[in-house]
């Protein structure tokens, strides 16, 4: 599937809270559509598929990208599910979002793609760039870049800064001190179901 650009609240109603996709919460707590309030029992496959879709929509990655991350996670000696989440969380667009420089991951991706973000003194416009401990992330020293980030910081997507990051609001500079721990992943997800979903596909 390609990257989603449709109504975000519709997806949130179907899959539940997706902090990276939207700050808004739907007025109706049931899925959209004529049969949204039905209580049909879902199959195990449908449940695993839904967990996978949470990752796709929350992090704004394509199916092809997620498969690539899954293959990389499997090669790790760590838990496959936790490594998968780590790879997604340590993307530059998500890190910019978690630093509070953008209210959503799509907003953070736009900042990165348009060259407003600097990593270790150089402009990096690749949203999938994997941040590593020691990376210093700052805003390009241009009025419009700083103004955009300062405006975004007034409406942060998430209230708490993860403990693997630090951020100086005066200089608009953040630093990655470690890889993210599982308990700091904001998305409510059962990553083991995603691993099971791909077990016969990848």
From Swiss-Prot:
Signal peptide (UniProt feature, chain positions): none
Superkingdom in the source lineage: Bacteria
Gene Ontology annotations for the cellular component aspect, listed alphabetically: small ribosomal subunit
Molecular function as annotated in GO: rRNA binding; structural constituent of ribosome
Pfam families, A to Z: Ribosomal_S4, S4
Region called Disordered, residue ranges: 16-43
CDD domains for the chain: S4
Keyword hit for rRNA-binding: yes
Span of domain S4 RNA-binding: 90-152
Ribosomal protein recorded as keyword: yes
SMART domains: Ribosomal_S4 (SM01390), S4 (SM00363)
Keywords attached to this entry: Ribonucleoprotein, Ribosomal protein, RNA-binding, rRNA-binding
Family (UniProt): Belongs to the universal ribosomal protein uS4 family.
Its job: One of the primary rRNA binding proteins, it binds directly to 16S rRNA where it nucleates assembly of the body of the 30S subunit. With S5 and S12 plays an important role in translational accuracy.
Subunit structure: Part of the 30S ribosomal subunit. Contacts protein S5. The interaction surface between S4 and S5 is involved in control of translational fidelity.
Name of the protein: Small ribosomal subunit protein uS4
Source organism per UniProt: Crocosphaera subtropica (strain ATCC 51142 / BH68) (Cyanothece sp. (strain ATCC 51142))
Gene expressing this chain: rpsD
